[in-house]
C-alpha cells in the first residue's frame, strides 16, 4: 500500500496498531526503512478489549456467533488511525485491504469489490461510516494478490513472503471455547441436546462449544448425519436436526449500516452474503416498520447463523450490511 501510494505521489507515514499480544514489528519497521518513510506504533489494547474482545465473549456465551473483524474495523482500527491522522495533520487513511472505495453519483461512498474475487475483503468492511470512507484509500484493491507480491519482491519488502491471515487475531488456534473459558474463568454449563420436537437426545458440553451447522464433535450416534440447528441460551439447549432443516429462505437483520443508499424505502433486489466464505446469493430486501430488514433469498441458504454479519451487494459494491438475528425454515 505504501509503495503504491508513493508511486502516485503521496507522502506516506507507516502506522501499525498494538491491539492484542505484543507483535514482532521488525518486518513492518524494515519495510518502512526500505521505503524511507517514517514509522510509528499506536497503542490500542484497552479500546480493542472494550469494543471487540469483551463483546465477542459475551455474544458467544449468549448463543451467538459474532463477526469480530467487522466490528474492529469501524470501532478500533479506523478510530485509532484517524486519531494519528488528526494529530499529524494527514488527510487520508490508507489500508492494505483487497477492496476499493467508490463514490457514487448520489454522493455516497461505498466499498467496491477487489479485482480479485477470491481475495475480496469488502464483507469485513461493511460497517465503515460515510465519514470514515471519505478519508480512506485502498490502492491494493486494483491489483490481484500475485501482482502485489511481485511488486513487493522486486524491491525486497519483507511482506512479500508473509502468509495470509486466516484466523481471528486474538484466537489464533481457532479454539474459541478455551479462549472464552480463559477470559471468563468460568466453564460453560452443560445441558441437553434436543431434536426439533424437544425430545432429549443427549448431553452437550456447554453452548460455547457449538455453532449453527456444526456436525463434528457432537458425540451423538445417529443413523443419519445430524447438525446443530439452534442454540437456546434461555433453556441451555442445543437443537439438532437433519441436513435439510438447516436451510432457510428468509432471515431478519438489524444493526444496519447503509452505504450505497441512505436507507431503503421499498423492496430492493440484491446479492446477499451471510458469512465471509459464502459466495453470495440473489435475494430481495424488504424494509420493516421497526427499521430492520427482512431478506428473502430466491433459493434456501444453509446455516444462517444469528450474530454473523450479512452483507448485501448491488453490482460490485456494498449496498448495506447488518447483523443476522433470526432465520425462518424453508418451505
Where are the model-predicted features located?
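Short, ordered coil/turn segments that flank beta-strands lining enzyme active or ligand-binding pockets
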Residues: 105, 150, 196-197, 289, ...
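Short gly/Ser/Thr-rich phosphate-binding loop of adenylate-forming enzymes
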Residues: 143
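Anionic-ligand-binding alpha/beta catalytic cores of soluble enzymes and soluble regulatory domains
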Residues: 151-196, 200-257
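ATP-dependent adenylation/nucleotidyltransferase module used to activate substrates
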Residues: 1-126, 137, 146, 153, ...
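Basic, glycine-rich polyanion-binding accessory segments appended to enzymes
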Residues: 224, 232-319, 323-324
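Conserved small/polar residues in nucleotide/adenosyl-binding loops
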Residues: 325-331
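Short, glycine-/aromatic-enriched active-site segment of Class I SAM-dependent methyltransferases
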Residues: 134
